[in-house]
Amino acid sequence: MPARACALLTLGLGLLSALATFPAAAEDPIRITQLKRCGDLFAEDSLSWCLSAKALPRGEVQLYLNGERVAADELQRDGEQLRLTLAADAVRSGPLWLERDGLRSNPVWLSAGRSQVLAAKPDEVARNMDDLTTYVDLVSLIIEEDHKGLEKARQLAEKYGAKVVGAIPPLNTYQLRLPVKDLTERDAMVLRLGSEVGVDAVVIEESAAENDEQETGKTADQKRPQNREWAANRFLDAVDYYRERIPAGQRAGEKQPVRIGIIERAVDFDAPHFAEYLEPCDPQQQRTCLYARDADRPDNHGSSVAGILAAHASDARDQGFLSALDGTGPGFEVIVERNSDAGITANVAASVNLVEDGARILNWSWGIHRIGTVDVEGEPVDSLLRSGIAMSGYEELLEEFFLWLRREHPDVLVINSAGNGSAHSGRDDYRLPSSFITEQLLVVGGHERNDQEKVAVEHPDYVRKRKSSNVDMRVDITAAACTRAATLDPDKRGDVHCGTSYATPLVAGAVGAMLSVNPGLEPDQVRELLRRSAMTIGRDSDFEPAEADDLTAPILPSERGYRLDDRDVGRSARLDMRKALELTVESLKNSR
């Protein structure tokens, strides 16, 4: 063989050998992006769910529910979609995931609850007179409680040529698809439906999903360290106290994991903060477990809200509060669930399912303003607006939800963001849901670090009111409003996001830890402990009507040992996560 040919052969073999040492390109990870009820929602003998996933392999894939593999004959496949059908009496709510060759997808929560509503497609919406996007042919009927809801809804559907397509059965609420082509026809039919005997209200859905309760635009907050903001609520002090100071028998023992529902769309499991949840997770092993659909970006709203509770970060200062308690408490389950993109109606449907699945806490980082709402300066609020007719329907739906909650689940606490319109949070004509007066709704405002004052963390001037935060007597407590978004690069810190959306999960996390210590706490007792333990914010004592610098209901003498001369009396309340845990431990000795 000529020398040149021999050299080329040797070079070729060397290249092949080198290439063989490199692993084959890894397959894209499987990510579940959607899971919802489908088929006949009212079937009695079987229930079906439709699952959509990215990078679903062409070969066989295994589906697991509650840790057990689902039989192949219960699955149907169509491209990147799977349909799961189970006998009604065999369904148990729990985590669901896909596996292929030992690799797992993100776990999502499958609810056995029967509440499910449909979202409108792009060609099923229109602009109304207020220039707001509204559903054309999908509305929901709230049936009066002395009627059988489904039977009445079907009667009305037959009468009007409509079809029942969704439901929130515990609230006697049913979604109809109307035989209309435009808003004029819809409004005429809505008026007729609203006057029918047995119909309490008609809910019109406006715009898309509402969970972006955050400020818009980038500001100087990008330089604001997250840990400094959380220090204002003694975040790390609370973690240390829980792990080191609370006896093991008081934070674990025979107690069950605490289940928390977050009404959000999705979480990006490609972000390092959430990658650990792609591995098997058992809350009974004193772990925090996270279940959610997968998002496309790590800086989405759901990832930021869920991360405050459940992020796993190499820097302890960026660790989620509940995940920082791993190995010490009874375990926590954080369920990110949205039902569908059918706006406020879907928020309520998801909340009902989560409560029926055992959630003790609901995190509602969302809210809406009525058109015409003005802020504390008298300027119009221009975000998250809804028309008067839509607000009326939402108010009725939320009222039914809280009545049901008080009647059937009095131990559940809803924690809601006050809003970012710099408006009054408690005016029921202009703001929902924070304006509701019920012991089972805790409203959270936002504060930020006051860099102009060099004072101790306990001092009222350590923080100041976040300018955009909604205010007034209906706000129960405040917490840090700014957090850093997750990123795909573990060595890179994300942008700062601010809003009462991110103050809310700080309170939800504190309440979750409190309930893990004393599961017997009732919602009014939780509120009492949070306000008794609170640090303060704001000016001197002022019991006058809320003004621009009044953030929460003023601290009362009864919340300070009935001392009229206590310096905290009359000031606004600021979350103290450590002190709240201390008082919770004391509550075990002083059961009411």
Regions found by a protein language model. Name each.
Residues A26-Q62, L103-D131:
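Beta-strand/beta-sandwich contexts
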Residues V117-L132, L191-R259, V267, A271-H273, ...:
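Protease zymogen maturation seam
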Residues A87-R92:
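Surface-exposed, short loops/turns at beta-strand junctions within beta-sandwich domains
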Residues M129, Y241-A346, D357, I371, ...:
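Subtilisin-like serine protease catalytic core
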Residues G102-A220:
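Primarily auto-inhibitory N-terminal propeptides
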Residues G12-L15, I361-N363, Q440-L441, N518-R592:
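C-terminal subdomain of the subtilisin-like protease fold in secreted/lumenal serine endopeptidases
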Residues E264-A266, P272, R431-S516, G520:
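Extracellular S/T/G-rich loop segment that most often corresponds to the catalytic His/Ser-adjacent loop
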Residues E337-F436, D489-P505:
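Substrate-binding/access-modulating region of protease and related hydrolase catalytic domains
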